[in-house]
Amino acid sequence: MYGSARTISNLEGSPSRSPRLPRSPRLGHRRTSSGGGGGTGKTLSMENIQSLNAAYATSGPMYLSDHEGVASTTYPKGTMTLGRATNRAVYGGRVTAMGSSPNIASAGLSHTDVLSYTDQHGGLSGSSHHHHHQVPSMLRQVRDSTMLDLQAQLKELQRENDLLRKELDIKDSKLGSSMNSIKTFWSPELKKERVLRKEEAARMSVLKEQMRVSHEENQHLQLTIQALQDELRTQRDLNHLLQQESGNRGAEHFTIELTEENFRRLQAEHDRQAKELFLLRKTLEEMELRIETQKQTLNARDESIKKLLEMLQSKGLPSKSLEDDNERTRRMAEAESQVSHLEVILDQKEKENIHLREELHRRSQLQPEPAKTKALQTVIEMKDTKIASLERNIRDLEDEVQMLKANGVLNTEDREEEIKQIEVYKSHSKFMKTKIDQLKQELSKKESELLALQTKLETLSNQNSDCKQHIEVLKESLTAKEQRAAILQTEVDALRLRLEEKESFLNKKTKQLQDLTEEKGTLAGEIRDMKDMLEVKERKINVLQKKIENLQEQLRDKDKQLTNLKDRVKSLQTDSSNTDTALATLEEALSEKERIIERLKEQRERDDRERLEEIESFRKENKDLKEKVNALQAELTEKESSLIDLKEHASSLASAGLKRDSKLKSLEIAIEQKKEECNKLEAQLKKAHNIEDDSRMNPEFADRLKQLDKEASYYRDECGKAQAEVDRLLEILKEVENEKNDKDKKIAELESLTLRHMKDQNKKVANLKYNQQLEKKKNAQLLEEVRRREDSMVDNSQHLQIEELMNALEKTRQELDATKARLASTQQSLAEKEAHLANLRIERRKQLEEILEMKQEALLAAISEKDANIALLELSASKKKKTQEEVMALKREKDRLVHQLKQQTQNRMKLMADNYDEDHHHYHHHHHHHHHRSPGRSQHSNHRPSPDQDDEEGIWA
């Protein structure tokens, strides 16, 4: 029971123990260690009883009810098929694997109730002293007579065996000498002789094996007889002790008078013993027949050996194949007959087991004595061992039959001889086995009462020890589960710390990115303003240079006119006498010219004032427009930074959602494990409650069961807490998802607003350009008018204007040099900022890749846990709907996780491709940075994360 070590403790004063019986050479080696028994005297070890039953396949006692008659000794054949050992588990389903004794199979007979005087109402232990002394004396006489007959038969068998062995050795020596002569004299035919030698050696090895087996059987029988004698001695002592104790018990507790029921029992016992004597005589006759058949087989072997020797001497090979076929068919028939006989025996043994278990159940209900149930349990174990040995023997014989069939032994011509030999072998094996079974049945009958009284005690003690072991195993499993939960909690805490560190690091980096983008935007705006100012200054310088060139040309023309006038004056002075009137006219013309010059100067001053006023108004308008552009750019940068902040916040929310999802999944897995553990603990508690019903008298069981109840309630509370934590995290996750959706909406609105602002700004810039072009046209027209007016100006005014223009040119050149220096310094700082920004982008990519790797690892861990749960449920081999549904649900979750893992890998590949494209675009943009630069748009394109990246940050497996 329960796989624990057992002993059968005797009553007080047991003087001897049964010796350990030798095992058959083909037996398995199961050894059960004998633990401490329950009595105060010496113990009869269970190991001896099991070895006795397993070695010799003893048929145990059969139990009938009170009103059953004596069953017949003829039985139907079993329906066992070849190639398969049927383990029929009846009334408890217990089949112990024991060894099988060679060529010994016991035929179990379902005859009378052997424990007829130890039956329902206390057996013979409470009857009068007359029955105690009369029945054992009859049993002893029958036992002694059968033992003497068996010893005589064994001695005869040993003598015959020795004679046969001597004859075999002589024939072996003759065969060896003939083979040596063949080697020396017939060398040309050595090949044929070698073949013959091999075949003869194989046959001889088979014959030797058969002889060895028969010799071992004889030795085995002798040893069994010795062991049975020792067991008989111990049985006598035990019977004597039982009689004394039952007499004392009858005097103290109760006295049962001789009734009709007891008389019937004694009469049935007498009839049974008469039948046993008849069966023993029958077995003796069968043994004699078997000895005769063995002699016949040995004679046939001698004849075959003689024929072989004659064949070797005459160098011929006649009828060799026929003899081989005959011998093989004989062996085949023997094996098949033995298999069929063992099948019949196995069916009978199973019937006996069923009957014994029913009897044990009935007795345990009627007589709650622990020793009797223990004895019945040991008898059942003996029967199981015998069944196992018979099944092993059947397997061996079936293997032999299959080997012979594979070698092609069975021929259709020799079918009749095979049938005859099979029948002969069946009769011999039946006779021998029935005889051995009868002897063993006697022993088991005599021991059954003691065994029945002792096995119940031992089963209860074994149940107690097994319950203790079971409780210890439950405690160990609980401690292991607690340790595992603690380890998982520490891992979860470590992952939380790591994720918090990553979040803080990401927040720092995002802040640095925001600061750098703001600085970059301001620097880009300043650079753009500087460039615009430089362009304006260059245009002014070009206009002034053109004015200077025009004025120089006008000066040259005026110089030429002056020289012409001087020449004319000189010519006029020479002609002064003739031209006084002309001088007067010239003076008048000069005065008119002076008046015209003064008028032109006044008009020029007025035009200059108007032009300066227009220039100042244009400058004011330019300043206003620049301030508006700067304000719009500042708004743009603020909105872009807020966009980036919102996206970073969305990514942080997504990462937080990922963490919560992972925590949720880990908690769900832990909850499932806890539920499974709770179910297991509840099942174990049910088992423990069942055990408690059987053993309420033991206070230790109650304490341990209370502890188990407390632990189960503690685990239920933990499961409830974990479920509440999961619900709370689910609510938090829903809130985070709602916040994320709100942020996404805000981001979309801000993006639409930024697009509108960009469009408005582009329109304003286009209007500004158009206004500047109009101003340029107006300035060009004014310059042309000034040129026209300056043509008529005096040389002094032209020189002054040239000097003023030269001074203005030098000032503009100095301003241009200063702006160039400022531009170089700002470009250098911008390059440094861009390098820092590139480093920050690389770090952000690395962090995103690490996050994706963590997601993939979490998914892989979840998939492996699902696989482990599926494997556990499939290994449990319970075909319940609930377990199948759980397996299907786990498989669906696993498929979903695999799909999410694929999505994560695709997102990671997209991220890598986007990073590569972004790096390439950034390099190209940096290469053409000095030629074409739009800071607002470039900033937007560089710092806005890709939609794939956003999706990837929002995905959680």
Curated annotation (Swiss-Prot):
Main localization, broad class: cytoplasm
Residue ranges with Polar residues bias: 1-13
Record-annotated disulphide pairs: none
Biased composition annotated in UniProt, kind: Basic residues: 922-943
GO cellular component: cytoskeleton; GABA-ergic synapse; glutamatergic synapse; growth cone; presynaptic active zone cytoplasmic component; presynaptic membrane; synapse
Acidic residues composition-biased segments: 948-957
Chloroplast as UniProt keyword: no
Key words, A-Z: Cell projection, Coiled coil, Cytoplasm, Cytoskeleton, Phosphoprotein, Synapse
Quaternary data: Interacts with BSN, ERC1, PPFIA1, PPFIA2, PPFIA3 and PPFIA4. Interacts through its C-terminus with the PDZ domain of RIMS1. Part of a complex consisting of ERC2, RIMS1 and UNC13A.
Biological classification of the source: Eukaryota, Metazoa, Chordata, Craniata, Vertebrata
Coiled-coil residues: 140-917
Protein localization: Cytoplasm; Synapse; Presynaptic active zone; Cytoplasm, Cytoskeleton
Protein name per Swiss-Prot or TrEMBL: ERC protein 2
Record organism: Mus musculus (Mouse)
Annotated stretches, region: Disordered: 1-44, 922-957
Modified residues (Phosphoserine): S65, S666
Biological role: Thought to be involved in the organization of the cytomatrix at the nerve terminals active zone (CAZ) which regulates neurotransmitter release. Seems to act together with BSN. May recruit liprin-alpha proteins to the CAZ.
